[in-house]
């Protein structure tokens, strides 16, 4: 009788450990999937629009003449992209120094 009790207790213990293991694995996998999703979005952001990126339709242009039809360019949103800026032509800021005054 004592042998049956320990056998049942062992089975309950194994089932409890199995449930804990499955629960911990599911919680770990869901965060892992989220991380993969973020990594995938970052990778897709570096690919040009037809193959990646997010297409953004420009807002309609409001003009005074309603009969005027202008062609709007299509754009796409590329998250975390760098904005290309050239040197300043106004002399305020920019990366190059054109005039150096001597003391």
UniProtKB/Swiss-Prot annotation:
What is the superkingdom listed in this entry's lineage?
Eukaryota
Give the motif span (SCOOP motif): 82-96
Segment Disordered: which positions? 54-103
Q: Where is the composition biased (Basic and acidic residues)?
A: 62-75
Report the residue ranges where the short sequence motif SxS motif essential for MIK2 binding is annotated in this entry: 88-90
Q: Name one GO cellular component term.
A: plasma membrane
Using the UniProt record, give the first listed, main subcellular location.
Answer: membrane
One Gene Ontology term of the molecular function aspect: LRR domain binding
The answer to whether UniProt assigns keyword Disulfide bond to this entry is no
Location comes to: Cell membrane; Secreted, Extracellular space, Apoplast
- What keywords were assigned to this record? Apoplast, Cell membrane, Cleavage on pair of basic residues, Membrane, Secreted, Signal
- Known tissue expression: Mostly expressed in seedlings shoots and roots, and, to a lower extent, in leaves, but barely in flowers.
Show which residues constitute the signal peptide. Answer: 1-25
Q: Which residue intervals are annotated with compositional bias (Low complexity) in the record?
A: 84-103
State how it assembles.
Interacts with MIK2 (via extracellular leucine-rich repeat domain); this interaction triggers the formation of complex between MIK2 and the BAK1/SERK3 and SERK4 coreceptors, and subsequent BAK1 activation by phosphorylation.
Sum up the protein's function in the record's words.
Answer: Brassicaceae-specific phytocytokine (plant endogenous peptide released into the apoplast) perceived by MIK2 in a BAK1/SERK3 and SERK4 coreceptors-dependent manner, that modulates various physiological and antimicrobial processes including growth prevention and reactive oxygen species (ROS) response regulation.
Per the record, the similarity remark reads:
Belongs to the serine rich endogenous peptide (SCOOP) phytocytokine family.
Q: What is this protein called?
A: Serine rich endogenous peptide 9
Can you name the source organism? Arabidopsis thaliana (Mouse-ear cress)
């Amino acid at each position: 009788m004592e042998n049956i009790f320990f056998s049942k207790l062992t089975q309950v213990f194994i089932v409890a450990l199995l449930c804990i293991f499955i629960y911990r694995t599911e919680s770990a996998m869901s965060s892992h999937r989220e991380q993969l999703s973020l990594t995938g979005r970052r990778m897709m952001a570096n690919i040009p629009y037809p193959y990646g990126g997010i297409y953004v339709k420009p807002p309609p242009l409001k003009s005074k003449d309603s009969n005027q039809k202008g062609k709007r360019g299509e754009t796409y949103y590329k998250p975390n992209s760098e904005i290309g800026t050239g040197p300043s032509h106004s002399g305020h800021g920019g990366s190059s120094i054109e005039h150096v005054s001597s003391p």
